[in-house]
Amino acid sequence: MEKMNITDQAHDAFVKAHPQGDLLQLTQWAETKTLTGWYSRRIAVGEDDEIVGVAQLLFKKVPKLPYTLCYISRGFVTDYSNKLALETLLEAAMQIAKEEKAYAIKIDPDVEVDKGADALSNLRALGFKHKGFKEGLSKDYIQPRMTMITPIEKTDVALIQSFERRNRSKVRLALKRGTTVERSNREGLKTFANLMQITGERDGFLTRDISYFENIYDALHPDGDAELFLVKLEPKPVLEDLRQELHELEDEKAKLADKKQDKKTLNKINDADNKIAKTQELIDEMVTLESTHPEGIYLSGALLMFAGKKSYYLYGASSNEYRNFLPNHHMQFAMMQYAREHGATSYDFGGTDNNPDKDSDHYGLWTFKKVWGTYLSEKIGEFDYVLNAPLYQIIENIKPKLTKAKIKLSRKLKK
């Protein structure tokens, strides 16, 4: 086993094809991190001219000190039962980390706990310090230790059937409501950034400037690894459908009126009246929208990312208006369809805790993500390889105070 010099294209091809590959290990992802002060270097190891493992090393300077942190997000990308590959990757990473004056090498492999016995054993044997099995969204981790993933390698009918019952109904209703899901372009990021601002104000979190999303799109879209989706509500076609629906409901009620007025028929008439009233409300809303925005308005948007057969719901945003049209439900299903059609077998909703209490800040995330036919992907967590013990200890002691300050600020924003 030896170090190899490979092209960025070869690195990305290996990452996309490997079971432990991840979006965060793609070379263009490193480009998106430059705005926040990170820079990257890459390593590869192999034998007989065949790549066995790779890693993208991100470095960030420690404020006011001539040192850096080396962070291998969702790496190494290799078979963790291969001790020699891990040892050779670590040696290569240490060489570069020392050149960059890193005080530690941090990794958080895309290896799940139920398949991670070899990884835990081998990494500890190499001298890595395991950071424990804390909650998925613990502030002690850089990346979530737990994510929710939907298997999408199935038909549309089977995919919807995999969702929880109430969510199935909402998705089917969303598809009937008439919103349009668009695969947008760079220009659409303006709309997306505006929706994100609305979302941040509603949910109490700081939002990114449009340049952040442009950076991601510019870096990853050319290779097909980033797509922007927007959901639009256009009043004219929706009005046509609603008026047709109203006509059918009124016909149904008229037929019921000609029947014997027993309890069963009266209940059906009452149900028809309720549906007619709700449909008329929607028609009134669309008439108003047609007068103010005849071309329609955008209600939600999201960035969908790819790394080989893995797809990721990265950022989502939505308007406060017309939420009864369920634009997010339509968008999620449409993005799953697109991901599947473009070779993905999984759809990652991102970080979560495992069944948090109702009073947890993360309960809402859990309840949203669990209804989409997801399973909990619990990773083995973070590992640190310490290169400068005194500095490492100082920084580890300071981090809890910084974390508390961030939590305090976040709670103030939500008030």
UniProtKB/Swiss-Prot annotation:
Pfam family, one: FemAB
EC supergroup of this enzyme: transferase
Stretches assigned to coiled coil: none
PROSITE patterns named in the record: FEMABX
Domain of life: Bacteria
Signal peptide annotation: none
Protein name: Lipid II:glycine glycyltransferase
Enzyme Commission number, as recorded: 2.3.2.16
Chief localisation class: cytoplasm
